[in-house]
């Protein structure tokens, strides 16, 4: 997958530590097309000390890790976004003023993919009070939920999944969301997704429903919060929404810490 923040973060971090970086564009690589993942892994593993992969299937990054012989970092797959979790955990720690195991956060929206999955597992592993607010059809898979509950038994985390957005955000320190339509999905899914998720939009009213005047808003970006992008304008013209998963008022408010997070 193409990238802005993830690529820049990896390249800046590597160069700050004195490492060289090579970027292979999706269109310029033969991975999985003319050369198998297994063969590519064994070639790159002989040239590089580490590999960062950002793509679609989790099975690809796992196969790279199996055969490369060097560390492989998951920069994002459809299923997980672990390096974003490092940023999210640090951001919550910086802004909460209390230990993570005393911190509560909610994720509202489509929770089936990398951010919903990863935040649920993150909260469980760190002993946090983590809530998912979404229609049940958009919850993480049973396997992810089971893994979160297993981790929570070890850490004392509290896991809540609910279809009630206001219940999800009650007394939390942070409210997370993400885009409602993921990269690679067709435009045709927008109407269905908007119908399903309209009650999970992060608005000033939902922020207030937390009952916490210090609650913070988080989003891994990019966000559809206004009409200033081609997609944002198309959504407005097609569905009448100025901002989708979050309103401009929340995104640009003092409660928004998305740029610290990103």
Swiss-Prot record:
It is found in: Cytoplasm. PANTHER family: ORNITHINE CARBAMOYLTRANSFERASE, ORNITHINE CARBAMOYLTRANSFERASE, MITOCHONDRIAL. It catalyses: carbamoyl phosphate + L-ornithine = L-citrulline + phosphate + H(+). This is Ornithine carbamoyltransferase. The keyword Signal does not apply. Its main location: cytoplasm. Carbamoyl phosphate binds at residues 3-7, 30, 54, 81-84, 219-222, 247. Reversibly catalyzes the transfer of the carbamoyl group from carbamoyl phosphate (CP) to the N(epsilon) atom of ornithine (ORN) to produce L-citrulline. L-ornithine binds at residues 114, 178, 182-183. The record marks 94 as: Important for structural integrity. Keywords: Amino-acid biosynthesis, Arginine biosynthesis, Cytoplasm, Transferase. SUPFAM superfamilies: Aspartate/ornithine carbamoyltransferase. Changing residue 57 to A: In strain: HF116. GO terms for biological process: arginine biosynthetic process via ornithine; arginine catabolic process to ornithine; citrulline biosynthetic process; L-arginine biosynthetic process. Changing residue 60 to T: In strain: HF116. Pfam families: OTCace, OTCace_N. It is an enzyme of class 2 (transferase). GO terms for cellular component: cytoplasm.
């Amino acid at each position: 997958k193409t990238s802005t923040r993830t690529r820049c973060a990896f390249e800046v971090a590597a160069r700050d530590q004195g490492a060289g970086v090579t970027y292979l564009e999706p269109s310029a690589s033969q991975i999985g097309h003319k050369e198998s993942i297994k063969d590519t892994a064994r070639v790159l593993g002989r040239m590089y000390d580490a590999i960062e992969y950002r793509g679609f299937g989790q099975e690809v990054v796992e196969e790279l890790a199996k055969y490369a012989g060097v560390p492989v970092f998951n920069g994002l797959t459809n299923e997980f976004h672990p390096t974003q979790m490092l940023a999210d955990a640090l951001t919550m720690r910086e802004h909460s003023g209390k230990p993570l195991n005393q911190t509560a956060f909610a994720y509202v929206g489509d929770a089936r993919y990398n951010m919903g999955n990863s935040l649920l597992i993150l909260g469980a592993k760190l002993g946090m009070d983590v809530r998912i607010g979404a229609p049940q059809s958009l919850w993480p898979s049973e396997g992810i939920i089971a893994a979160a509950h297993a981790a929570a038994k070890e850490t004392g985390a509290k896991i809540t999944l609910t279809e009630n957005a206001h219940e999800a955000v009650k007394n939390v320190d942070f409210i997370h969301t993400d885009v409602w339509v993921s990269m690679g999905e067709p435009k045709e899914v927008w109407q269905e997704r908007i119908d399903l998720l309209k009650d999970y939009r992060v608005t000033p009213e939902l922020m207030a429903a937390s009952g916490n005047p210090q609650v913070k808003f988080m989003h891994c970006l990019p966000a559809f919060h206004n009409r200033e992008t081609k997609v944002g304008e198309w959504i407005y013209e097609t569905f009448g929404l100025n901002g989708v998963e979050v309103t401009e008022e929340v995104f640009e408010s003092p409660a928004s810490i998305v740029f610290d997070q990103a």
